Design a protein with these regions (language model features):
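Active-site adenylate/phosphate-handling loop in enzymes that bind or generate adenylated species
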Residues: 102-156
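The feature marks non-catalytic terminal segments
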Residues: 1-2, 7-14, 109-113, 146-148, ...
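Active-site rim/loop-helix segments in enzyme catalytic domains that contact anionic ligands
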Residues: 1-116, 141-145, 201
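Structural signal for conserved beta-strand scaffold positions within catalytic alpha/beta enzyme cores
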Residues: 52, 84-86, 122, 151, ...
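Short histidine/acidic/glycine/proline-rich micro-motifs that form metal-
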Residues: 55-60, 88-92, 124-129, 184-189
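Short aromatic-enriched loop/helix-cap "lid" or pocket-rim segments at secondary-structure transitions
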Residues: 62-64, 133, 160-165
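Residue-level signal for the nucleotide or nucleotide-sugar donor/cofactor binding architecture
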Residues: 25, 130, 172
Length: 214
């Protein structure tokens, strides 16, 4: 995770309506970037809300619903609410105002339902994928009232990502993440979706932080 200060997460667990918001440009971004962390927070009682900005059509064959893949994957991770949008894949930078409004609307809807967001996870501003950068830009505006915003790591920002905060999870959390990613059958051919890749990265970041898995 990329943040100046992560703080103590215990304050997040005061009640079951404590909200965590996760934002991704495409189906699988959230699961790849913070899947184990979300599973851990869900188990501790946080209400997980996810937003996916595009259908990810440019990344798979026609006729496949990547939103459905993510819905199943995020369910495994304990996500209670998923909001999906259909902004144009690979061209989201042209719709920033509309994306900001869409995220704003989700936040307000959830707040009206009694959910109190204390943290948001979003994409990194130095990501090589233009949709990921747009997701970051929109999130920073739309989530301005949320006390803490953390940026997660994805394969397309690996070279530029320098973690400033680490979140530890256990073996069960890692297995949850690996199990969730298996629902993304349209992406199973990609190297970064393989369990050995996911585990190796978690171990590497753990070594950096003096933990078992991050």
């Amino acid at each position: 995770m990329d943040s100046k200060h992560i703080g103590n997460v215990n304050y997040l667990m005061e009640n079951s309506r404590t909200g965590i918001l996760a934002i991704g440009a495409h189906p699988d971004d959230i699961e790849l970037g913070c899947g184990a962390t979300l599973a851990n927070l869900a188990q501790k009682g946080c209400h997980i809300t996810a937003i996916i900005l595009t259908a990810g059509n440019a990344g798979c064959a026609s006729g496949i619903s990547r939103h459905d893949e993510s819905r199943q994957a995020l369910n495994i991770l304990g996500c209670q609410d998923l909001f999906t949008f259909h902004f144009e894949d690979t061209r989201t930078e042209h719709y920033l105002d509309a994306i900001i409004t869409s995220i704003d609307d989700v936040i307000k809807t959830q707040q009206d339902a009694g959910i109190r967001f204390l943290r948001a996870y979003t994409m990194h501003d130095k990501d090589r994928h233009q949709d990921h950068r747009a997701a970051h830009q929109a999130s920073m505006v739309a989530c301005r009232t949320i006390p803490q915003i953390l940026c997660y790591e994805t394969p397309s920002c690996r070279l530029s990502f320098v973690p400033q905060a680490f979140e530890e999870f256990n073996e069960a959390g890692l297995e949850n993440k690996i199990s969730a990613l298996k629902f993304h059958q349209s992406q199973k051919h990609r190297d970064y979706m393989q369990p050995t890749y996911i585990r190796s990265l978690a171990q590497f970041r753990g070594l950096q932080a003096g933990m078992a898995l991050c």
